[in-house]
């Protein structure tokens, strides 16, 4: 386990900066999950419907999805650290204001501001990690970065509900903003080491081959394939995570307690798979093979769950296997994107492909919700499995394109 997360062999300044970047990513996921556990309390306070309150998430995702790529260009132009600090400061301020003021429309507006802050994380994070990680440790650093985000999602419900019980939902929002400001202070205390790309930015020289890229480069087939990969993994992951419990109940009459354990198994093993995938991607350079294999296993297992009413222990084991297989692919996914990114263009490229998360997360509730409304719970598993297999085709197509070039 020490090998998975150790950065001791890297320069200490770079190590501390990477730790700060991962902490910021943890906060980004923490912030994204804030509304869910506090939804009932906020709705009662504002006296609005669930649909009206859901507008906050819609505004957040639209702003984040539309502006993430332009912010990626900004990362490559002025530097990733300053953009990350600005994004975290903006997010923290938005949630503090949302908790301080008693207006529903201010609350909605602050989710738009938070969406703007959210655009900084992936472009800036991946740029900093790519520039300040040793190549032989990069896949493990990517894995730990992803794991940090999962950790933020995991601790959000319990800490937010604890703060709500003492200070109300507004106090919970302000407390979360304070957490973000603490991480911000850590980032401010860690200056970015002067790597070659920083020297070029400071001297005003050409910003390396990728710094001047535009939209024409981003719509190249190799980049669009990665956008599709991010979109499809978000589509299958968000849908299955959200609808697994109700689909199992409707299809097989699975008790809610067992279905919840199955979901917990999927999520926990997904996180473990990410860490294992970081080590694997560092040892095996065929990242496309790792991604394709993991998605094939996940798709096959998901289809199996949709076909058969399995004993509880086997169901829990298979959902865990599916989660582990998908998690195994994430570090390789990031390495595949990095492989097609010119030096100096990490912000723009990672910002662009990361919009796939917003696209997939927006489509998933519609498709999976329609399947449940049409009383087709089996379709939840078959659709998720099919998307996983289509995702495999994007990996293999991208690999064939790179070989042809």
Residue ranges of model-derived segments:
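Juxtamembrane intracellular "pre-TM" segments in multi-pass secondary transporters
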Residues: 2-12, 194-226
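Cytoplasmic helix-loop-helix junction between adjacent transmembrane helices
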Residues: 110-148
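Extracytoplasmic gate region of multi-pass secondary transporters
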Residues: 35-36, 221-267, 271
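Helix-to-loop junctions at the C-terminal end of transmembrane segments
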Residues: 67-79, 274-286, 372-373
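Cytoplasmic membrane-interface "Motif A"-like loop-to-helix N-cap segments
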Residues: 77-87, 283-295
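Conserved MFS/SLC helix-loop-helix module at the cytosolic interface between two early adjacent transmembrane helices
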Residues: 66-102
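Residue-level signature of mid-helix packing/kink "hotspots" within the transmembrane helices
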Residues: 33, 61-69, 153-154, 267-275, ...
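Helix-loop-helix hairpin linking two adjacent transmembrane segments in secondary transporters
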Residues: 145-193
């Amino acid at each position: 386990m020490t090998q998975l997360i150790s950065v001791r062999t890297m320069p200490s300044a770079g190590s501390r900066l990477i730790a700060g970047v991962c902490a910021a990513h943890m906060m980004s996921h923490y912030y994204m999950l804030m509304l869910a556990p506090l939804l009932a309390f906020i709705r009662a306070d504002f006296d609005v419907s669930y649909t009206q309150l859901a507008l906050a998430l819609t505004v957040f995702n639209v702003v984040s999805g539309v502006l993430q790529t332009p912010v990626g260009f900004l990362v490559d132009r002025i530097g990733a650290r300053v953009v990350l600090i600005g994004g975290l400061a903006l997010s923290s301020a938005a949630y503090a204001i949302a908790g301080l003021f008693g207006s529903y429309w201010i609350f909605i507006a602050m989710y738009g501001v938070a969406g703007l802050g959210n655009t900084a994380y992936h472009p800036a994070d991946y740029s900093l990690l790519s520039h300040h990680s040793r190549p032989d440790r990069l896949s493990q650093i990517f894995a730990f970065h992803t794991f940090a985000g999962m950790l933020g999602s995991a601790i959000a419900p319990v800490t937010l509900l604890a703060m709500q019980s003492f200070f109300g939902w507004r106090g919970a929002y302000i407390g979360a903003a304070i957490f973000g400001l603490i991480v911000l202070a850590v980032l401010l205390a860690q200056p970015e080491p002067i790597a070659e790309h920083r020297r070029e930015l400071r001297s005003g020289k050409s910003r390396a081959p990728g710094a001047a890229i535009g939209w024409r480069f981003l719509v190249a087939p190799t980049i669009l394939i990665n956008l599709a990969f991010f979109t499809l993994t978000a589509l299958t992951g968000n849908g299955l995570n959200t609808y697994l419990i109700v689909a199992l109940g409707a299809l097989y009459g699975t008790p809610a307690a067992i279905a919840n354990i199955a979901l917990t198994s999927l999520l926990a093993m997904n996180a473990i798979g990410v860490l294992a995938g970081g080590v694997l991607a560092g040892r095996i350079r065929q990242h496309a093979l790792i991604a394709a294999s993991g998605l094939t296993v996940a798709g096959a297992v998901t289809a199996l769950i949709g076909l058969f009413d399995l004993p509880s222990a086997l169901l829990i084991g298979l959902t865990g296997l599916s989660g582990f297989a998908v998690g195994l692919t994430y570090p390789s996914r990031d390495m595949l994107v990095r492989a097609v990114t010119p030096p100096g263009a990490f912000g723009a490229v990672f910002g662009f492909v990361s919009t796939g998360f917003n696209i997939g997360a927006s489509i998933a509730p519609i498709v999976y919700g329609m399947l449940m409304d049409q009383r087709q719970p089996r379709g939840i598993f078959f659709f998720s499995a099919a998307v996983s297999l289509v995702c495999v085709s994007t990996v293999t197509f991208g690999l064939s394109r790179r070989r042809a070039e």
